[in-house]
Amino acid sequence: MSDVIKNFFKLESAGGILLVIAAAIAMMIANSSLAPMYDTFLHSYIGGMSVSHWINDGLMAVFFLLIGLEVKRELLEGALKSKETAIFPAIAAVGGMLAPALVYVAFNMGDPEALSGWAIPAATDIAFALGIMALLGNRVPVSLKVFLLALAIIDDLGVVVIIAFFYTSDLSVLALVIGFVMTGLLFLLNAKHVTKIRWYLLVGFILWVSVLQSGVHATLAGVVLGFAIPLKGNKGERSPLKHMEHALHPYVAFAILPVFAFANAGISLEGVSLDSLTTTLPLGVALGLFLGKPLGIFSFSYLAVKSGVAKLPTGVNMKHIFAVSVLCGIGFTMSIFISSLAFGGVNPEFDKLARLGILMGSTFAAVVGYALLSISLPKKAA
């Protein structure tokens, strides 16, 4: 049995499989007699924050740290090294935020209260999207994975800006100032060629606390820290960035992401009817994610390539881009977070309807995106 387990964890797709299993277990528990226990656990407080809060703002900051490390490495010496390939995911991300929001607005023009949820389908759940992609293992070109990483990070940063400007009423200026100072200090350490990881982790922790207290999504601190870690060590030293990336990967893939999925996928379907699913609010969210996302990402990507503004990453074609654009319709936790900000304290019924739309759109995006990606990729890695 131990050999079976060891062989499983060696699989490229193992992390994605664990994430899907964890999400499925959460859904089953949330719709069983164990639901109250599940809810009580997630809302139990440890050190002033709920378990759910620790997972989403604490553990996921480590995940975003790894993402920051991977994207920085690709920008400096990998698939995003040229200007044309680096700008490509940024252009795609803009389309991926605009089109879903417009689809949602088109469905809810007649309801001013529902319109406040316009940003719900603009988000991409990077963890779930990567988890589904990971199911295909080493068939996925590194350059395509990096495109998804970069696109989703820019998308998430855009959502953070949206939250700050449209959904946050109590930003802490002092905490933001401290956060900016810590960010400056991190890049000063980099500029001075400091390669000892512990100094970056110390400043990064203070940055995380300040961002957490500021009212902005704390996972942003992880991305900033990842970009500050130096790629090259001093003479004779190993790469700090690559060392940290290698060390974090198994913890993120086999612990943090499955825990995240378990904590966020438990959506109750109690009281759900066909009539409630076909009202404009959940339809706007679901179609914004499932149709708006690929429409925006693919059309902006296509125009960017055809106009010569950007170019496709090595080993990637437009079929791959379309499959990834569908996969980006997995809004899930980021969309749920925005829904809670838009409706949670004002209209709980709207919040529930939005979550149903998120579940529908994200599920369709995951299934269809996986199928399209599987069809478009070679059967075996080259």
UniProtKB/Swiss-Prot annotation:
Its main location: membrane. GO terms for biological process: regulation of pH. Coiled coil: none annotated. It is found in: Cell inner membrane. It catalyses: Na(+)(in) + 2 H(+)(out) = Na(+)(out) + 2 H(+)(in). Keywords: Antiport, Cell inner membrane, Cell membrane, Ion transport, Membrane, Sodium, Sodium transport, Transmembrane, Transmembrane helix, Transport. InterPro entries: Na/H_antiporter_dom_sf, NhaA. Pfam families: Na_H_antiport_1. The chain crosses the membrane at residues 14-34, 49-69, 87-107, 117-137, 146-166, 171-191, 205-225, 252-272, 285-305, 321-341, 356-376. GO terms for cellular component: plasma membrane. GO terms for molecular function: sodium:proton antiporter activity. It is a multi-pass membrane protein. NCBIfam families: NhaA, PRK09560.1, PRK09561.1. Na(+)/H(+) antiporter that extrudes sodium in exchange for external protons. Belongs to the NhaA Na(+)/H(+) (TC 2.A.33) antiporter family. This is Na(+)/H(+) antiporter NhaA. It comes from Aliivibrio fischeri (strain ATCC 700601 / ES114). The gene is nhaA.
